[in-house]
Protein backbone atom coordinates (compact mmCIF):
# COMPACT_ATOMS: atom_id res chain seq x y z
CA UNK A 1 0.00 0.00 0.00
CA UNK A 2 1.22 3.51 -0.75
CA UNK A 3 1.21 5.50 2.50
CA UNK A 4 0.69 9.18 1.89
CA UNK A 5 3.72 11.25 2.94
CA UNK A 6 2.75 14.75 1.93
CA UNK A 7 0.43 16.44 -0.42
CA UNK A 8 -0.17 19.97 -1.52
CA UNK A 9 -3.01 21.35 -3.63
CA UNK A 10 -3.09 24.79 -5.15
CA UNK A 11 -5.18 26.81 -7.54
CA UNK A 12 -4.74 29.81 -9.81
CA UNK A 13 -7.98 31.34 -11.01
CA UNK A 14 -8.49 34.57 -12.93
CA UNK A 15 -11.22 35.88 -10.64
CA UNK A 16 -11.83 39.06 -8.61
CA UNK A 17 -9.55 39.06 -5.58
CA UNK A 18 -9.88 40.28 -2.02
CA UNK A 19 -7.61 40.15 0.99
CA UNK A 20 -10.53 39.27 3.26
CA UNK A 21 -9.70 36.69 5.92
CA UNK A 22 -12.51 34.57 7.32
CA UNK A 23 -12.75 32.87 10.70
CA UNK A 24 -13.27 29.10 10.96
CA UNK A 25 -15.90 28.12 13.53
CA UNK A 26 -16.59 24.88 15.39
CA UNK A 27 -16.79 21.51 13.67
CA UNK A 28 -20.03 19.58 13.33
CA UNK A 29 -20.67 16.05 14.55
CA UNK A 30 -18.97 13.79 11.97
CA UNK A 31 -21.11 11.95 9.44
CA UNK A 32 -19.98 8.51 8.31
CA UNK A 33 -19.64 8.31 4.52
CA UNK A 34 -17.97 5.03 3.56
CA UNK A 35 -15.58 2.26 4.53
CA UNK A 36 -14.12 -0.40 2.25
CA UNK A 37 -15.47 -2.95 4.71
CA UNK A 38 -18.94 -1.97 3.46
CA UNK A 39 -17.98 -3.55 0.14
CA UNK A 40 -15.16 -6.00 0.77
CA UNK A 41 -15.58 -7.12 4.36
CA UNK A 42 -11.90 -6.45 5.09
CA UNK A 43 -10.41 -3.60 3.08
CA UNK A 44 -9.24 0.02 3.24
CA UNK A 45 -10.11 3.34 1.60
CA UNK A 46 -8.40 6.66 2.29
CA UNK A 47 -6.95 9.84 0.71
CA UNK A 48 -10.23 11.14 -0.74
CA UNK A 49 -10.64 13.49 -3.67
CA UNK A 50 -14.13 14.68 -2.73
CA UNK A 51 -16.23 16.32 -5.45
CA UNK A 52 -19.43 18.08 -4.42
CA UNK A 53 -22.63 17.30 -6.29
CA UNK A 54 -25.68 15.08 -6.31
CA UNK A 55 -24.35 12.64 -5.38
CA UNK A 56 -21.08 13.56 -3.70
CA UNK A 57 -18.29 11.58 -5.33
CA UNK A 58 -15.32 10.21 -3.40
CA UNK A 59 -12.31 9.03 -5.41
CA UNK A 60 -10.09 7.09 -3.01
CA UNK A 61 -6.99 5.00 -2.65
CA UNK A 62 -8.73 1.65 -2.12
CA UNK A 63 -7.85 -1.99 -1.56
CA UNK A 64 -8.21 -3.89 -4.82
CA UNK A 65 -9.91 -6.82 -3.09
CA UNK A 66 -10.65 -8.12 0.39
CA UNK A 67 -7.58 -8.87 2.53
CA UNK A 68 -5.33 -7.46 -0.20
CA UNK A 69 -2.80 -4.65 0.19
CA UNK A 70 -2.72 -3.42 -3.37
CA UNK A 71 -4.04 0.01 -4.32
CA UNK A 72 -6.64 0.74 -6.96
CA UNK A 73 -8.60 3.95 -7.30
CA UNK A 74 -12.29 3.56 -6.54
CA UNK A 75 -15.21 5.90 -7.09
CA UNK A 76 -17.79 5.89 -4.32
CA UNK A 77 -21.05 7.72 -4.85
CA UNK A 78 -22.12 8.57 -1.33
CA UNK A 79 -25.25 6.59 -0.56
CA UNK A 80 -24.77 4.51 -3.70
CA UNK A 81 -22.24 2.33 -5.50
CA UNK A 82 -18.47 1.85 -5.13
CA UNK A 83 -16.45 0.61 -8.10
CA UNK A 84 -12.83 0.43 -9.22
CA UNK A 85 -12.15 3.07 -11.89
CA UNK A 86 -8.34 2.94 -12.23
CA UNK A 87 -6.04 -0.03 -11.75
CA UNK A 88 -2.50 -1.15 -12.43
CA UNK A 89 -2.11 -3.67 -15.25
CA UNK A 90 0.58 -5.06 -17.53
CA UNK A 91 4.21 -4.13 -16.97
CA UNK A 92 4.31 -0.34 -17.26
CA UNK A 93 5.62 2.31 -14.88
CA UNK A 94 2.34 2.24 -12.89
CA UNK A 95 1.39 -1.43 -13.06
CA UNK A 96 1.33 -2.11 -9.30
CA UNK A 97 -0.11 0.62 -7.05
CA UNK A 98 -2.51 3.32 -8.30
CA UNK A 99 -3.34 5.71 -5.46
CA UNK A 100 -3.98 9.28 -4.24
CA UNK A 101 -6.34 10.60 -6.93
CA UNK A 102 -7.14 14.24 -7.64
CA UNK A 103 -9.94 14.94 -10.10
CA UNK A 104 -10.46 18.27 -11.87
CA UNK A 105 -12.33 19.75 -14.81
CA UNK A 106 -9.94 20.55 -17.70
CA UNK A 107 -9.88 19.92 -21.45
CA UNK A 108 -7.26 17.33 -22.44
CA UNK A 109 -6.76 16.42 -26.12
CA UNK A 110 -5.59 12.81 -26.53
CA UNK A 111 -5.66 10.45 -29.51
CA UNK A 112 -7.84 12.76 -31.58
CA UNK A 113 -10.46 13.38 -28.89
CA UNK A 114 -10.75 16.16 -26.29
CA UNK A 115 -11.64 14.86 -22.84
CA UNK A 116 -13.27 17.02 -20.16
CA UNK A 117 -11.78 15.68 -16.92
CA UNK A 118 -8.34 14.74 -15.63
CA UNK A 119 -7.45 12.45 -12.76
CA UNK A 120 -3.91 12.88 -11.47
CA UNK A 121 -2.68 9.87 -9.52
CA UNK A 122 0.34 8.23 -7.92
CA UNK A 123 1.60 5.11 -9.66
CA UNK A 124 4.46 2.69 -9.18
CA UNK A 125 5.79 -0.65 -10.37
CA UNK A 126 6.83 -2.30 -7.09
CA UNK A 127 5.07 -3.93 -4.17
CA UNK A 128 6.33 -1.22 -1.83
CA UNK A 129 5.95 2.44 -0.94
CA UNK A 130 8.72 3.39 -3.37
CA UNK A 131 9.62 4.36 -6.95
CA UNK A 132 6.55 6.58 -7.23
CA UNK A 133 5.70 8.89 -10.12
CA UNK A 134 2.61 10.88 -11.08
CA UNK A 135 0.36 10.05 -14.00
CA UNK A 136 -2.86 11.37 -15.45
CA UNK A 137 -5.99 9.67 -16.72
CA UNK A 138 -8.77 11.36 -18.69
CA UNK A 139 -12.52 10.95 -19.10
CA UNK A 140 -15.53 12.58 -20.70
CA UNK A 141 -17.41 12.72 -17.40
CA UNK A 142 -16.88 12.19 -13.69
CA UNK A 143 -18.00 8.57 -13.83
CA UNK A 144 -15.46 7.58 -16.49
CA UNK A 145 -14.35 5.37 -18.08
CA UNK A 146 -10.86 6.70 -17.38
CA UNK A 147 -8.11 6.34 -19.97
CA UNK A 148 -4.48 6.62 -18.88
CA UNK A 149 -2.00 8.77 -20.74
CA UNK A 150 1.05 6.59 -21.43
CA UNK A 151 3.79 8.48 -19.57
CA UNK A 152 4.14 10.10 -16.15
CA UNK A 153 3.56 13.83 -16.02
CA UNK A 154 5.99 14.03 -13.08
CA UNK A 155 8.69 11.40 -13.30
CA UNK A 156 10.42 9.61 -10.45
CA UNK A 157 13.03 12.10 -9.17
CA UNK A 158 15.23 9.76 -7.14
CA UNK A 159 18.50 8.00 -7.75
CA UNK A 160 17.46 4.63 -6.28
CA UNK A 161 14.24 2.69 -6.85
CA UNK A 162 14.02 2.21 -3.07
CA UNK A 163 13.36 5.93 -2.59
CA UNK A 164 9.80 7.22 -2.27
CA UNK A 165 9.88 9.62 -5.22
CA UNK A 166 7.01 11.85 -6.41
CA UNK A 167 3.37 11.36 -5.56
CA UNK A 168 0.24 12.46 -3.74
CA UNK A 169 -0.79 14.82 -6.53
CA UNK A 170 -3.44 17.45 -6.08
CA UNK A 171 -4.62 19.67 -8.90
CA UNK A 172 -6.83 22.68 -9.49
CA UNK A 173 -8.05 24.19 -12.71
CA UNK A 174 -6.55 27.39 -14.08
CA UNK A 175 -8.49 27.53 -17.36
CA UNK A 176 -10.54 24.48 -18.31
CA UNK A 177 -11.04 25.47 -21.95
CA UNK A 178 -7.35 26.22 -22.48
CA UNK A 179 -6.31 22.98 -20.78
CA UNK A 180 -4.29 24.40 -17.89
CA UNK A 181 -4.09 23.34 -14.26
CA UNK A 182 -1.86 23.86 -11.29
CA UNK A 183 -0.46 20.54 -10.13
CA UNK A 184 1.11 20.11 -6.72
CA UNK A 185 2.75 17.04 -5.27
CA UNK A 186 5.10 15.57 -2.69
CA UNK A 187 8.73 14.91 -3.42
CA UNK A 188 10.09 12.42 -0.91
CA UNK A 189 13.82 11.73 -1.02
CA UNK A 190 16.49 10.92 1.59
CA UNK A 191 17.08 14.67 1.93
CA UNK A 192 13.51 15.14 3.15
CA UNK A 193 9.92 15.64 2.05
CA UNK A 194 8.89 18.84 0.29
CA UNK A 195 5.82 20.09 -1.50
CA UNK A 196 6.23 21.21 -5.09
CA UNK A 197 3.90 22.88 -7.56
CA UNK A 198 3.88 23.69 -11.25
CA UNK A 199 1.59 24.67 -14.08
CA UNK A 200 0.63 21.83 -16.41
CA UNK A 201 -0.73 22.64 -19.86
CA UNK A 202 -2.52 20.17 -22.11
CA UNK A 203 -3.37 22.74 -24.76
CA UNK A 204 -0.94 21.42 -27.34
CA UNK A 205 -1.46 17.73 -26.55
CA UNK A 206 1.23 16.08 -24.39
CA UNK A 207 1.42 17.77 -20.97
CA UNK A 208 3.93 20.60 -20.59
CA UNK A 209 5.18 21.28 -17.04
CA UNK A 210 6.26 24.86 -16.34
CA UNK A 211 7.06 27.22 -13.45
CA UNK A 212 7.97 24.46 -11.01
CA UNK A 213 8.60 25.68 -7.49
CA UNK A 214 8.93 24.53 -3.88
CA UNK A 215 5.92 25.37 -1.72
CA UNK A 216 6.26 27.15 1.63
CA UNK A 217 6.27 25.15 4.84
CA UNK A 218 3.76 25.67 7.63
CA UNK A 219 4.98 27.32 10.82
CA UNK A 220 8.01 25.60 12.29
CA UNK A 221 7.29 22.21 10.74
CA UNK A 222 9.96 20.50 8.68
CA UNK A 223 7.49 19.06 6.19
CA UNK A 224 4.02 19.17 4.72
CA UNK A 225 2.32 15.81 4.75
CA UNK A 226 -1.10 14.46 3.93
CA UNK A 227 -2.83 17.71 3.18
CA UNK A 228 -5.24 19.23 0.72
CA UNK A 229 -6.12 22.80 -0.21
CA UNK A 230 -9.28 24.52 -1.33
CA UNK A 231 -9.44 28.04 -2.77
CA UNK A 232 -11.83 30.86 -1.90
CA UNK A 233 -11.95 33.22 -4.92
CA UNK A 234 -13.65 36.19 -3.16
CA UNK A 235 -11.04 36.09 -0.39
CA UNK A 236 -8.11 35.14 -2.63
CA UNK A 237 -7.20 32.68 0.10
CA UNK A 238 -6.16 29.07 0.27
CA UNK A 239 -7.39 26.85 3.10
CA UNK A 240 -5.35 23.82 3.99
CA UNK A 241 -6.20 20.69 5.94
CA UNK A 242 -3.34 18.45 6.93
CA UNK A 243 -2.31 15.75 9.35
CA UNK A 244 -1.22 17.29 12.65
CA UNK A 245 2.21 16.88 14.21
CA UNK A 246 3.86 15.41 16.10
CA UNK A 247 2.53 11.95 15.30
CA UNK A 248 1.38 9.89 18.29
CA UNK A 249 3.96 7.87 20.19
CA UNK A 250 3.59 4.96 22.54
CA UNK A 251 0.98 3.17 20.44
CA UNK A 252 0.65 1.86 16.90
CA UNK A 253 0.28 2.90 14.17
CA UNK A 254 2.73 5.78 14.65
CA UNK A 255 2.89 6.82 10.96
CA UNK A 256 -0.54 8.49 10.78
CA UNK A 257 -1.88 11.32 12.90
CA UNK A 258 -4.44 11.60 15.67
CA UNK A 259 -5.57 15.12 14.73
CA UNK A 260 -5.92 17.48 11.78
CA UNK A 261 -4.87 21.08 11.40
CA UNK A 262 -6.56 23.73 9.26
CA UNK A 263 -4.52 26.73 8.12
CA UNK A 264 -4.83 29.44 5.49
CA UNK A 265 -2.67 31.76 3.44
CA UNK A 266 -3.30 34.60 1.01
CA UNK A 267 -2.86 33.98 -2.69
CA UNK A 268 0.14 36.31 -2.72
CA UNK A 269 1.71 34.48 0.19
CA UNK A 270 1.13 31.12 -1.39
CA UNK A 271 2.87 32.22 -4.55
CA UNK A 272 5.93 33.49 -2.72
CA UNK A 273 5.49 37.02 -1.35
CA UNK A 274 8.27 37.33 1.28
CA UNK A 275 7.15 37.44 4.89
CA UNK A 276 3.64 36.08 4.26
CA UNK A 277 3.03 32.68 5.84
CA UNK A 278 0.32 30.32 6.95
CA UNK A 279 -2.19 31.20 9.68
CA UNK A 280 -3.38 28.27 11.79
CA UNK A 281 -7.17 28.48 11.88
CA UNK A 282 -8.48 25.38 13.64
CA UNK A 283 -7.79 21.84 14.83
CA UNK A 284 -9.89 18.69 14.56
CA UNK A 285 -8.95 16.36 17.42
CA UNK A 286 -10.02 12.95 18.65
CA UNK A 287 -12.37 14.75 21.01
CA UNK A 288 -14.40 15.60 17.90
CA UNK A 289 -13.78 12.46 15.82
CA UNK A 290 -13.92 9.91 18.65
CA UNK A 291 -11.27 7.64 17.09
CA UNK A 292 -7.61 6.90 17.95
CA UNK A 293 -6.33 8.05 14.55
CA UNK A 294 -7.58 10.88 12.31
CA UNK A 295 -5.62 11.15 9.08
CA UNK A 296 -5.43 11.44 5.28
CA UNK A 297 -7.93 14.31 4.91
CA UNK A 298 -9.29 16.23 1.97
CA UNK A 299 -11.68 19.11 1.41
CA UNK A 300 -15.04 18.84 -0.28
CA UNK A 301 -14.49 20.92 -3.43
CA UNK A 302 -16.05 21.85 -6.73
CA UNK A 303 -14.74 20.29 -9.92
CA UNK A 304 -12.43 23.31 -10.17
CA UNK A 305 -11.00 22.99 -6.66
CA UNK A 306 -12.92 25.88 -5.09
CA UNK A 307 -15.30 26.07 -2.15
CA UNK A 308 -18.77 24.76 -3.00
CA UNK A 309 -20.16 27.10 -0.34
CA UNK A 310 -18.26 30.26 0.63
CA UNK A 311 -19.79 30.20 4.11
CA UNK A 312 -18.36 26.85 5.23
CA UNK A 313 -15.48 24.39 5.05
CA UNK A 314 -16.17 20.66 4.79
CA UNK A 315 -13.41 18.16 5.54
CA UNK A 316 -13.56 14.50 4.52
CA UNK A 317 -11.10 12.56 6.64
CA UNK A 318 -10.03 8.99 7.39
CA UNK A 319 -10.42 7.45 10.83
CA UNK A 320 -8.64 4.38 12.14
CA UNK A 321 -8.24 2.27 15.23
CA UNK A 322 -5.13 0.81 16.81
CA UNK A 323 -2.98 -1.95 15.36
CA UNK A 324 -2.93 -4.84 14.61
CA UNK A 325 -6.02 -4.14 12.48
CA UNK A 326 -5.73 -0.38 12.02
CA UNK A 327 -5.52 -0.56 8.22
CA UNK A 328 -8.71 -2.58 7.96
CA UNK A 329 -10.60 -0.11 10.14
CA UNK A 330 -10.14 2.89 7.83
CA UNK A 331 -13.42 4.79 7.50
CA UNK A 332 -14.29 8.05 5.72
CA UNK A 333 -16.18 10.77 7.59
CA UNK A 334 -17.36 14.30 6.91
CA UNK A 335 -17.43 17.31 9.24
CA UNK A 336 -18.28 20.95 8.50
CA UNK A 337 -17.37 24.29 10.10
CA UNK A 338 -18.78 27.76 9.39
CA UNK A 339 -16.56 30.25 7.59
CA UNK A 340 -17.40 33.84 8.50
Annotate the PLM regions:
Residues 23-96, 105-162, 172-222, 232-290, ...:
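Beta-rich carbohydrate-recognition and catalytic domains
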Residues 47-49, 100-102, 168-170, 226-228, ...:
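Conserved beta-strand position repeated once per blade in WD40 beta-propeller domains
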Residues 293-305:
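A short, acidic, amphipathic alpha-helical segment used as a generic capping/interface helix at domain edges
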Amino acid sequence: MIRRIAAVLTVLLLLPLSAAHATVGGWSTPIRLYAASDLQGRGYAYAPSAVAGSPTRLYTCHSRAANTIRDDIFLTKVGGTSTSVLTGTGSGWDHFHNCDPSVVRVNVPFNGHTYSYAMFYLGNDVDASAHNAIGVAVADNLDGPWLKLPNPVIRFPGSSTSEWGAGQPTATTINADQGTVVLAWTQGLPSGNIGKAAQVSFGSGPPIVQFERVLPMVGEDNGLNNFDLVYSPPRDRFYMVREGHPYPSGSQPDYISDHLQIASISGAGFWGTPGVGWTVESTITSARTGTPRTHNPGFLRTIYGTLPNESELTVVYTSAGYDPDSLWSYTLWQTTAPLS
